[in-house]
């Protein structure tokens, strides 16, 4: 039988990573040419520091309100930051750094909450099939991420290039349409894909209550299997003892 939650998680991951790569492909150009930030390395340093520091928070929030709801909070926050970037002008360093750090704060949620959701999905498969196929599921997740990143990057760069943005010459060498294309791709492009992902997360079927019942079912199955094995092992040992006693060979 098909694993509905698994297919939904894969679709969500595809959309989110497509949106992220759609923006990331042109991040350097937006930061350098639109905002004019002179120290891009410093921006990314604080971005990743905020991201790694926030991982425990997002995992805690996932346990508190449910992983899919926490992931919704992550996407809504990132979408709001993306929309706010549209109003930045050259020289708005402080506002950009603030928004960039907030986006970095959400990095942990974007990366780890889908993995946590997939771990729950593995339990659905285990309950239905009785087997452990976590490795296969995570391989599918990794493949989906790579597909989304490849397509998102290619589509994004081609759009801004075809509409007149010149990466080597920056704003001065680009058309007005090309500069606006860069703004829209960086700021609004991800929001489209986040919105589609949010629609799938909104009525996500594997709620915390359902997952708890599923875990209890798996625990009962494990206990029954352990009891059956113990009974079979005990029966085998007891049947072997008379044969040993009746052996005609001297000890």
Residue ranges of predicted features:
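Short, intrinsically disordered terminal tails adjacent to the first/last structured region
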Residues: 223-251
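Membrane-embedded alpha-helical bundles of multi-pass transporters/translocases
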Residues: 1-228, 249-250
């Amino acid at each position: 039988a098909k694993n509905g939650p698994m297919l939904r998680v894969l679709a969500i991951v595809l959309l989110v990573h497509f949106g992220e790569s759609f923006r990331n492909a042109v991040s350097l150009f937006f930061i350098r040419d639109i905002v004019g930030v002179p120290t891009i390395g410093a921006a990314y340093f604080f971005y990743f520091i905020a991201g790694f520091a926030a991982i425990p928070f997002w995992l805690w929030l996932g346990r508190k309100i449910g992983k899919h709801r926490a992931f919704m909070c992550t996407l809504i926050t990132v979408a709001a930051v993306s929309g706010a970037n549209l109003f930045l002008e050259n020289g708005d360093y402080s506002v950009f750094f603030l928004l960039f750090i907030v986006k970095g704060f959400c990095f942990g949620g974007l990366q780890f909450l889908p993995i946590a959701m997939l771990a729950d999905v593995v339990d659905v498969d285990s309950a239905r099939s009785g087997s452990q196929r976590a490795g296969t599921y995570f391989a599918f997740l990794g493949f989906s991420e790579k597909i989304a990143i490849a397509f998102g990057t290619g589509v994004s760069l081609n759009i801004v290039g075809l509409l007149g943005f010149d990466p080597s010459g920056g704003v001065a060498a680009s058309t007005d349409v090309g500069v606006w294309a860069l703004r829209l791709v960086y700021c609004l492009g991800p929001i489209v894909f986040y919105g589609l992902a949010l629609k799938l997360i909104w009525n996500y079927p594997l709620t915390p209550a359902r997952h708890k019942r599923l875990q209890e079912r798996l625990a009962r199955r494990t206990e029954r299997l352990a009891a059956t094995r113990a009974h079979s092992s005990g029966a085998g040992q007891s049947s072997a003892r008379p044969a040993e006693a009746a052996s005609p060979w001297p000890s």
